[in-house]
Amino acid sequence: RSSDLILVEALSVLTKLTVVGVCDTHRTYTQKIAGILGADPSQLTMDYVGLYHLGWIQDVKMGGRSRMAQLLELLESREEEGLDYDLIELFHMIPTRVTGMYFHRADVVRKQQHCTRFRAEGLYEAEQQILRMYEDPHLDMIPELTRQRDASWYSDSIIPLIQGFEGHAPLTTVACVLNQGSIKDLSDESSVEIPVSVNRKGVKAHKVGLLPRFLKGVFWSIKESDRLTIEAHRQRSFDLALQAMAVNPFVDSITRARKYLEKAASLENINLH
């Protein structure tokens, strides 16, 4: 699985397709926040902005009125798993889990370096077992192991989206689409993850306006990395691919980036010049 964000941008740049990507992160946080507020998730509207899983909930509305102040007040007196309270207190917004990892990335790397087993290794083994289970023609239910591996049920996001396109039920959700002026700080051709309205006529991105100032730099770096990645693919260019990694805020060493790129190109038989 690749990230839908760069695929939306690449397919839009390289083809004439109209592309929409779906990520399940916003639905997870909608349910969590609804539980904190004691509200029905369907009543909430999220002012969400993100790139990949690096997302922020800037506001939460119910019936057109902001409930953000109430949410922040409730969070002061309770401990919710999966929320980064340091970032909430500092920026007065709700970050996603991966956003928390970015702002604590040195700690995350240190923890991974000393762990006995990577999470990916456990997931890989579980996937192999699940695939063997699905070879059984008599299997008529989802294996419990699938639930244990913390699966995301994309059907809960994708089916309503398809129904919205077919005109069965207009939908407001969060999706990966081309920016087209929604975020003023980014180019129209950038793919972004923002609120959209979906109906039989298609998908319409909501206006986001300007990014919070503290987000501008990292978002610009990520989108430049995406642009360089797509251009590297188009030109089959090693230098552009390395540039894409060098400006990516998650990459801390061009030396390691070069070694990784050389190894990946060799293993995957990618012809870069």
What kind of region is each of these model predictions?
Residues 12-19, 64:
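A glycine- and small-aliphatic-rich helix-loop capping segment at beta-alpha/alpha-beta transitions
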Residues 5-6, 19:
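Tubulin/FtsZ superfamily GTPase core signature
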Residues 34-273:
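Long, compositionally biased stretches enriched for glycine and/or charged residues
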Residues 8-13, 31-34, 58-60:
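Short acidic, glycine/serine/threonine-rich loops at helix termini
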Residues 16-33, 37:
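Acidic, His- and aromatic-enriched active-site or binding-groove loops in soluble protein domains
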